[in-house]
Amino acid sequence: MYKILLADDERIILDGMAGIIEWESLGASLIGKAQNGHEAYEKIVHKQPHIVITDVKMPGMDGLELIKKVSAVSPSVQFIVLSGFGEFEYAKEAMKYGVKHYLLKPCNEQQIISSLEEIIAELKRQDVHKKKTAHLKHELDHIRSFAADQYLEGLIAGVAQLSPPPSLAGKKIRLLILKGEQSIDAAAREALGSALTAVCSSGEWTVLAVEENAAEKVAEVFADRKMAISQAGELRHAGQLFRDTAEASGDLHGSAVISKMIRLIADELGNPNLSLKWAAKDMLFMNPDYLGKLFKQETGEKFSQYVTRVRLEHAMKQMKIRRDVSVSEIAEEIGFGDNPKYFSLVFKKYTGLTPSEFRRKQGGASAG
């Protein structure tokens, strides 16, 4: 049903048009009436009619002002303009805004119906065209998606390809590698949207190519799946990205990942930003929740507990052999930043002694 709105300051004309025309037989419905331009505009904005039949002369805001204002916000709205004799200048002005139907008062029922039929026929043609265009776009997207999937599969399998599909040439991506041949459901595809470039299966893995800046979105969508994410690179290098990531991740839940995390902790011990989230997102490109569970499973400790323990054991060692170095310097070196008081609290909780007491017990002077 096409929605119609009437606007005329003369109540008799307004009610007459509303009652005399059989709207449903035209495939239309009358959604409202207005007696001035301001009221008509408000109803157009809120009810979104397809067609507005309006008088030219109305109080407050006339028909031409109404057409101008509506054209700026809803250019698809079609108008039928009613005017009195000798108002041709109004007609010329209305035509500038695409108005094709201009009826001279007094007009009869058939004239209005004829104008409505012409507009509705045109709207139907537009609807058919939109549907055809949407269908063709869907088909084209499907073809492009299939081509992208085939291209990715060839790269992962090591099959030489002359060139990628034109839409993917030079595209930067990350590979998301999921353990197991699991299909990507419609909800996941919809959540990733345009960030999803291609999908394929390779042995025991499902591989997705996603836009390089989509790592966070991917982690959210697949939070409950065992996965690894590659470094960023061009799609044409997907084969190497896949091999590097699969090798580094082992079976995506084995000790290879944890070994990499432990090496990372040792290398970044002095980094105050060292955290599970930072390591997962910026260094390992994996889901932090999954990585945290995996770390606890493999080591028996939470990531944060492990980091604190390693830092404190390193601090104790340094306090023994570097007796001339202050506690605050050692605290900063192992990632506690410029916060020696917090270091002292953590140190005492772990050892039962303050740093000064620990040093005295070791037989060394206390450096501040």
From Swiss-Prot:
Subcellular location: Cytoplasm
Domain Response regulatory: 3-120
Pfam families in the record: HTH_18, Response_reg
InterPro entries: CheY-like_superfamily, Homeodomain-like_sf, HptR, HTH_AraC, Sig_transdc_resp-reg_receiver
DNA-binding region: 278-299, 327-351
GO molecular function: DNA-binding transcription factor activity; sequence-specific DNA binding
Modification after translation: Phosphorylated by YesM.
Highest taxon in the source lineage: Bacteria
Chief place of localization: cytoplasm
Modified residues (4-aspartylphosphate): D55
PROSITE patterns: HTH_ARAC_FAMILY_2 (PS01124), RESPONSE_REGULATORY (PS50110)
Family matches, as SMART domains: HTH_ARAC (SM00342), REC (SM00448)
A GO cellular component entry from the record: cytoplasm
Keywords from the UniProt entry: Cytoplasm, DNA-binding, Phosphoprotein, Transcription, Transcription regulation, Two-component regulatory system
Name this polypeptide is given: Uncharacterized transcriptional regulatory protein YesN
High-level lineage: Bacteria, Bacillati, Bacillota, Bacilli, Bacillales
